[in-house]
Amino acid sequence: MGGWSSKPRKGMGTNLAVPNPLGFFPDHQLDPAFKANSDNPDWDLNPHKDNWPDANKVGVGAFGPGFTPPHGGLLGWSPQAQGLLTTVPAAPPPASTSRQSGRQPTPLSPPLRDTHPQAMQWNSTTFHQTLQDPRVRALYFPAGGSSSGTVSPAQNTVSAISSTLSKTGDPVPNMENISSGLLGPLLVLQAGFFLLTKILTIPQSLDSWWTSLNFLGQTPVCLGQNSQSQISSHSLTCCPPICPGYRWMCLRRFIIFLCILLLCLIFLLVLLDCQGMLPVCPLIPGSSTTSTGPCKTCTTPAQGTSMFPSCCCTKPTDGNCTCIPIPSSWAFAKFLWEWASVRFSWLSLLVPFVQWFVGLSPTVWLSVIWMMWFWGPSLCNILSPFMPLLPIFFCLWVYI
């Protein structure tokens, strides 16, 4: 069976008409698809065929006892695949030559020109020449695009890529700046939430103070709990909706909200008047009407930039025009004082006393200290509900 012979072939696999593609029969060659050619069509008579010496062995294989596929089992040539149990000794670990223990420092990475020399050869010129290829240019400029030989966007892109690759690395972001940038809004949010919670307690505190005036020296008790409705004992400022005193509690808090709003508006008005943003014409003695018609020369803006007039003009009945400049600050306060002085003549008698009292600064300070010492505890109890409004007034004073 090892060479060419004219003797009739014997044994299994002699019938060439029987297909044997996987070669599971002894003394038969594999499928011609593995080594097929037109010169050796007769694979059973091929002198270079594989005689499969392992195919005649009888042993426990991957396909059961007494049958082992040629060229090893489907699981391979390993002893475990052939059904033989063997113990492979584990290779001992290599002996360490370093006496140091623990984590060693990471060695420095070699430069790019040593590890990837091909990357250093890919410069901008090579990249630009590659872009001249029609197949590559078609990716950047589809049908209907530019057909010129030079690709202008590619040069800009290459310059940007080259400038990016020329850097050794981007700088590490400063974590201190990032934390400070996040800390500011968080502090503002926390302060705003704190002020909001305190402001919401103002109506309840003022309501307690209001109701305590009716129970001097006693604990305020809601009178609605003594009615026919079965209501548990509660404070006068926390009436449930089924309590008859609930409507009065809502009315008191509504009035308190209006008073707080009025207080904020008064503070804003004083602030605007102090900065001269309320151009109110003062009262002129003996004037009946105020007009800006025939006296436009007197109503020119102050310093040429202000949108408010710098003076007021009056037009009496005889037709003569009188102009008085508007105060740069406290115009509205002076207007109110003049108006009150006209209505109440006795207020003019207080002007010298107020001027004398203000002129005595040590006396004024001593008086203020004495009043705070005497009435301090009572004033603190009265003004404590309004303390959360002080930061709001301060912010308005600074930013307006």
Swiss-Prot record:
How is this protein used?
Systematic vaccination of individuals at risk of exposure to the virus has been the main method of controlling the morbidity and mortality associated with hepatitis B. The first hepatitis B vaccine was manufactured by the purification and inactivation of HBsAg obtained from the plasma of chronic hepatitis B virus carriers. The vaccine is now produced by recombinant DNA techniques and expression of the S isoform in yeast cells. The pre-S region do not seem to induce strong enough antigenic response.
Q: Where is this region: Pre-S1?
A: 2-119
Sorted alphabetically, the Gene Ontology cellular component annotations on this record are: membrane; viral envelope; virion membrane
Chain positions covered by the region annotation Pre-S2: 120-174
Q: Which residues does the annotated region (Disordered) include?
A: 29-50, 85-118
Residues that span the membrane, as ranges: 182-202, 254-274, 349-369, 376-398
Quote the subcellular location field of this record: Virion membrane
Q: How is it modified after translation?
A: Isoform M is N-terminally acetylated by host at a ratio of 90%, and N-glycosylated by host at the pre-S2 region. Myristoylated; this modification is essential for its interaction with the host protein SLC10A1/NTCP.
Give the encoding gene's name: S
Q: How does it assemble?
A: Interacts (via its myristoylated pre-S1 region) with the host SLC10A1/NTCP; this interaction is essential for viral entry.
Q: What is this protein called?
A: Large envelope protein
Q: Which family does it belong to?
A: Belongs to the orthohepadnavirus major surface antigen family.
Which segments carry the region annotation Pre-S?
Answer: 2-174
Its GO biological process annotations read: caveolin-mediated endocytosis of virus by host cell; fusion of virus membrane with host endosome membrane; virion attachment to host cell
Q: Where is the composition biased (Polar residues)?
A: 96-106
